[in-house]
């Protein structure tokens, strides 16, 4: 894949069930208040560490607030060599109404 794909929550959930990595690019306090279960918080401070440790061929879903900022972040990951990248349409706001049982809080990643 040379570009990322925009996907709805249902497609993202199917990918999660197959082991996709979810990264949440919202600010740390917002992430801690509630995020997709299993999502890793990634920001400008830890993005280099995330990239170094990542399997570039594993599917990665990028989530933000509403699905806008995640598109830029997904494009950046593709530019860094990731081959299977998705942007969550509707972001966390749509996710939490679609899958309220798939939300965690706190800083655990």
Curated annotation (Swiss-Prot):
Catalytic activity: thiosulfate + hydrogen cyanide = thiocyanate + sulfite + 2 H(+); thiosulfate + [thioredoxin]-dithiol = [thioredoxin]-disulfide + hydrogen sulfide + sulfite + 2 H(+)
EC number(s) on file: 2.8.1.1
PROSITE patterns, per the entry: RHODANESE_3
Gene3D superfamilies: Rhodanese-like domain (3.40.250.10)
Annotated Rhodanese domain residues: 16-104
Entry keyword set: Cytoplasm, Transferase
Pfam families: Rhodanese
Location(s), subcellular: Cytoplasm
Biological process according to GO: glycerol metabolic process
Keyword RNA-binding: no
HAMAP family: Thiosulf_sulfurtr
Stated role: Transferase that catalyzes the transfer of sulfur from thiosulfate to thiophilic acceptors such as cyanide or dithiols. May function in a CysM-independent thiosulfate assimilation pathway by catalyzing the conversion of thiosulfate to sulfite, which can then be used for L-cysteine biosynthesis.
Protein name (Swiss-Prot/TrEMBL): Thiosulfate sulfurtransferase GlpE
Gene: glpE
